[in-house]
């Protein structure tokens, strides 16, 4: 599938840095677009920056679980990634077999959402 892509024959693209400069920052790196990036763009204007990092990068496991791609991160990225690592313990494999009482929890989450988000979002 990738054999016909001419980028595969450019030696500079086959280095750790590729087209990027060391320490350029993850905001300068083209990454695949998925649900994490989508919800980040929906919520970024309403949440603290730390929460934005958690939303945007919580599925970037090579970086926050394995410590990969440090050479692309800015000092600010490295600082913010402590929040991504903190969040990861509540993300994958943290589900309980016991179903929560949605009606009991609803007021808490409605208040939390109202604290950060306007009544209507631009989806």
Where are these regions (language model features)?
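Divalent metal-dependent catalytic cores for phosphoryl transfer on phosphate-bearing substrates
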Residues: 1-103
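Broad structural signal for hydrophobic residues in well-ordered alpha-helices, predominantly aliphatic
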Residues: 43, 112-113
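Non-catalytic terminal regions of proteins
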Residues: 94, 113-123
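Intrinsically disordered, low-complexity polar regions and short flexible loop motifs
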Residues: 109
């Amino acid at each position: 599938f990738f054999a016909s892509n001419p980028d595969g024959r450019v030696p500079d693209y086959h280095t750790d840095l590729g087209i990027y400069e060391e320490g350029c920052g993850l905001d300068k790196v083209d990454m695949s677009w998925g649900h994490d990036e989508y919800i980040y763009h929906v919520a970024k204007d309403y949440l603290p920056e730390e929460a934005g990092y958690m939303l945007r990068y919580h599925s970037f496991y090579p970086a926050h679980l394995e410590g990969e791609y440090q050479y692309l991160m800015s000092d600010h990225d490295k600082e913010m990634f402590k929040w991504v690592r903190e969040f990861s313990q509540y993300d994958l494999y943290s589900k309980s077999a016991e179903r929560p009482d949605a009606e009991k929890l609803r007021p808490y989450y409605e208040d939390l959402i109202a604290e950060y988000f306007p009544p209507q979002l631009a989806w």
